[in-house]
Amino acid sequence: MITKEDFSIDDRVEKMKKPEMGVIVTFLGVVRGEGEIKGMNVEVYEKMAVDELEKLEREAREKFEVEAVEIVHREGSLKVGENIVVILVGAKHRKEAFRACEYLIDELKERVPIWKKEV
């Protein structure tokens, strides 16, 4: 999912919870402020990005023993400290969830047409 609006991690976690899951692993990327950086502009080729994010979610469910996967990425002008991306992976056991989460962030950075420019 691509959005201009901020997201609540708590809300996303609550929506993902299922009785068969023993763990939900989350990765949260935020705008880092170093030196004179005031924020970040995030540009997205939306149609292609949404398609690729959905593909990544399917791949993670197939490659790893996970029950649920969700990726939410922001676009637009973001300030230091604001959320950029959240990845949630629900599974019965933590090892597969952590492996899937790491796979997803690595693949997202390589494959999804999203460009970030510090301002």
Segments and roles (model prediction):
Residues 1-83, 90-119:
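N-terminal, polar/charged subdomain of small-to-medium soluble alpha/beta proteins
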